[in-house]
Amino acid sequence: MLRRLVIAGVAIGTLAASFGAATAAQATNATSVRNSHICAAPTQGSAACNAIRHDVVDSHGNPVPNLTPSGFKPADIVAAYGLGGGAGQTVAIVDAYNDPTAEADLGVYRAQFSLTACTTANGCFKKEGQTGTSTLPAKNTGWAQEISLDVDMVSAACPACHILLVEATTSSFANLATAVNTAAATPGVVAISNSYGGSDQGELSAYNHPGIAITASTGDAGYGMESPASFPHVVAVGGTTGFTTSAWSGAGSGCSTINAKPAWQTAATSCSGKANADVSAVADPNTGVAVYDSTANKGVSGWLVFGGTSVSSPIIASAYALGGNLAGYPAQYTWAHTTNLSDVTTGSNGTCTTSVWCKAGTGWDGPTGLGTPNGVGAF
């Protein structure tokens, strides 16, 4: 799987107009923005998180702290997609390594946006290791910020959902699969979000649990397939720029030559195997979301702006938790209810032999799938 560093020069005035007023320090010192992957590229048999941090940098290339939240906020996500609410459904987040400040940072995020507290003490939040015990893995600062991104997005899209965080010991697919099985075996879990990916491979049984929506990011390197999004029974989640405007150029997509075509995917994919994506949500780091994490990665912590399909996967998992149409394989319900999605018809993520795999258009396309949520009628 290819990984790339994306550097975009965006005027501070444009950034402020898109995401709220910049701090005085940003307005004075910052000249550009830098988008960078926070997790190391995956080795064989392992995955990397699909989070891209959007840092404002000064003329020396040093990140300028966000003193207040910047990026899309919970109210923006709820309004754009018709989400919000919830009734105690549990969304599980599977990631690698430990974020030691996950619960405290979640508290800061939810308090900032006037969301009800979600804590271990009140039964809303639970963190455990990959086998369901209190033994947690070692800290990894990149994955720690991925974890905060994931739990913040569930909080934004489904503020009354409970959150189960299962931390795999390492980023190997063997350990991540163990964590997914642990999440699936936990009573009350209705959706499991996986904001990571590695090279396309055959489906692992851990990602096949009827009655649970298992979502996965399609990747952040443009056209090309990643697992577990390529697995037939996983809902592959692509990405857009903004909420419904255009396909994001970094979203993964394609046609698997390894995994079989799910029965519910139609001829529109022009693919004899599993085609990515199924659906999509905001992912472009230049139209990113607000996240809070106090575990510093490369010297950066606090209020952050993130993009990548790591953003879109937990949003879609939350949509399934809210919609509740989980019988059998939830993706099948989505493919049968496309009128409840907003079609994305412009943009592309690269060059491909079959245009629908990499270019957005009317109906299904690779970068954005069937579209973005328009309420929860497709979920």
Task: For each feature predicted by the language model, list its residue ranges.
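An often Trp-containing, charged/polar helix-loop segment at the C-terminal end
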Residues: 317-320, 324-370
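Phosphate/diphosphate-binding glycine-rich loops and adjacent basic-rich segments that engage nucleotide
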Residues: 244-255
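Substrate-binding/charge-relay-adjacent region of secreted/lumenal peptidase catalytic domains
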Residues: 25-237, 257-307, 313, 317, ...
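Secretory targeting and sorting signals
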Residues: 1-27
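Ligand-binding/active-site lining segments
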Residues: 240
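Short, surface-exposed amphipathic charged segments that create phosphate/polyanion-binding patches used
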Residues: 180-181, 249-251, 359
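N-terminal hydrophobic or amphipathic segments with adjacent small-residue motifs
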Residues: 7, 213, 232, 302, ...
